[in-house]
Amino acid sequence: MPDMQTSRDTRKIPISKVGVKDISYPIVVMDKNRKFQQTVARVNMYVDLPHHFKGTHMSRFIEILNAYREDIALDKMEPILQEMKKKLGASSAHLEIEFPYFIEKRAPVSGARSLMEYTCTFTGTLAETFDFVLGVQVPVTSLCPCSKELSRYGAHNQRSHITVRVRYAGFVWIEELVELIEGCGSSPVWSLLKRADEKFVTERAYENPKFVEDIVREATLALAAHEAITWFSVEAENFESIHKHSAYAAIEQDKRKA
């Protein structure tokens, strides 16, 4: 049968990324407390395409993914990328995996146990060398210092997302990043709180007001102090409870250039 993908293209325009996006797929993630955790990810797979080829072979991405169906994990990122380059005749390959990860937490006063969900990402790129970035999004509570200063009856507060991405030497647990970052807001959040817990959490947030700028600076101090982390970016978004808009701040730091 004719292979249209390998036919010549005369426009002389190379493509940086082409492939398949938003595949729902089961994966296994290392869990600090339970060894392994099974979850379902959204997967994106791309390669570059030389200017002289009309298209890439989309089915081969799925074939590669299926070949690793029992073993899609962090340590398989580079082998999968190598296989993508080889089977698709590419000079660079990109693999993005986003998944929910669950950590058991105890409420601060009652000790009630509940599972907290964190959105995590594995992003791998292989050209001449392999590059990997671990990402975690951590929800926290933020309470406005200005509102606290001005108001006689309290202060506006809201849920915030702190998103960190790190490169590292050695190994970094997802749990480590969550623990580092949860303390950077006015208060962590929990799935389950009893009345005594709610009192503790709201009072803690009130006593620990943070602007979005404070949050990214606190996160920067925490990430910079971690010996294994070599590069990081941190973003904070406050979903303002008294505004239509969000407040946002971001910092990126390469410790290798310090």
From Swiss-Prot:
Keyword Cell cycle: no
Top-rank EC class of the record's enzyme: hydrolase
Protein's GO biological process: tetrahydrofolate biosynthetic process
Reactions performed catalytically: GTP + H2O = 7,8-dihydroneopterin 3'-triphosphate + formate + H(+)
Pathway linked to the protein: Cofactor biosynthesis; 7,8-dihydroneopterin triphosphate biosynthesis; 7,8-dihydroneopterin triphosphate from GTP: step 1/1
Keywords, alphabetical: Hydrolase
Positions in coiled-coil regions: none
E.C. code: 3.5.4.16
Residues annotated as site: May be catalytically important: C144
Gene Ontology terms for molecular function: GTP cyclohydrolase activity; GTP cyclohydrolase I activity
Function: Converts GTP to 7,8-dihydroneopterin triphosphate.
Similarity comment: family membership: Belongs to the GTP cyclohydrolase IV family.
Protein name: GTP cyclohydrolase FolE2
Protein source organism: Geobacter sulfurreducens (strain ATCC 51573 / DSM 12127 / PCA)
Lineage of source species: Bacteria, Pseudomonadati, Thermodesulfobacteriota, Desulfuromonadia, Geobacterales
Gene: folE2
